[in-house]
Amino acid sequence: MEDCIFCKIVQGEIPSYTVYEDDVVKAFLDISQNTPGHTLVIPKKHVKDIFEYDEELAAEVFKRIPKIARAIKASNPDIKGMNVMNNNGEVAYQSVFHSHWHLLPRYSSDDEFKINFTDHSDDYASEDYEAVRQSIADQFKD
């Protein structure tokens, strides 16, 4: 894609701090470094978001993520965990519209990276869960 910054990185038009590359993906340090070692994994093929993946591309990208995550973790004994995140759509904080997976090493719960999961379970009755479940399950019917 002509104006895509990640496509330009794949094509070598823009430099990156590449940690891993093969014929399917490229993994490079996120310029923001939310935590030290914050790495992006992108498919070399331009897909905007998760909704554009076919099963083959999804399998090829996802099977590489654990290997890259293990290398990041092994690179620093202070890494205690890792968040693996993918944002899809502007409302979900996607800022570059070439699908990418964030691998965020975690050093402690005080490392400035925060995710806020709010518990809304008190707002849902059994019937509400069932209605949501049914709506999603219906999408798998032929």
Feature annotation, model-predicted:
Residues 1-142:
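HIT superfamily nucleotide-processing domains
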